[in-house]
Amino acid sequence: MYNRIISYLEKFSIPHNHQFGFRSKHSTTHALLLLTDKIQRSVDNGTYSCGIFLDLCKAFDTVDHKILLAKLEYYGIRGVVHDWFASYFSNRRQFVSLFGTNNYSDYQIVTCGVPQGSVLGPLLFLLYINDMPKCSNTLEFHLFPDDTNLFFNNPNILNLETILNVELEKVTQWLFANKLSLNIEKTSFVVFHSPQRWIAHKLNLSSSSMSVKSVNQVKYWGLIFHSNLN
């Protein structure tokens, strides 16, 4: 089933172009090179750029089955295959066992989430967040399971802040509509700029439901990005 679905998705170019997780010819290396190039170009042009690094809280476990099935249908996965996925999600059960004992909890019906460790789980999650970039025509999105980057640049630091706060609210509303939440402690932003260009204004980024912390550097996909890109 995985091969059939991935072949169909790639044939009709359904995955977002900056969707880098679990796709052929779209590795994290490509994502890192793309982001680094964007930042470097911004610094060379004398503009300010901001990377907002989102960390989704229990991303795979909170996927809403009804929303996911609706998205599968939207992407053209219908008929027998759609029914197969509906059956795949129905009546899934889980229980908790105490290690080293024969004590087990009662079975509970699983109403959300995609199976972690499965072949289909990551692919289904990528389809679940595939339409996130549609919530903003201003931001550039780099998508990866539970680790998404938003990028924007502007020559004026005050305009950068104003626009980002407006767009961040759109992202927050998308997350709410799709029943996903951010790990606030691990979500942060970095303002990238030339070492010779001092920032007189400290950015404050927030939405109606959260405030994003500012940091001088962030570790993203194993690479540390510093505000001066040094």
Predicted segments — roles?
Residues A31, L35, L124-Y128, L164-E167:
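Hydrophobic alpha-helical membrane-association signature
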Residues Q40, R93, P133, E169-F176:
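Structural signal for well-ordered, non-membrane alpha-helices
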Residues Q19, S49-A59, F85, G113-G121, ...:
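Catalytic palm active-site di-aspartate
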Residues R4-N17, P122-F152:
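Active-site palm subdomain of RNA-directed nucleic acid polymerases
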Residues M1-P115:
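Conserved pre-catalytic core of RNA-dependent polymerases
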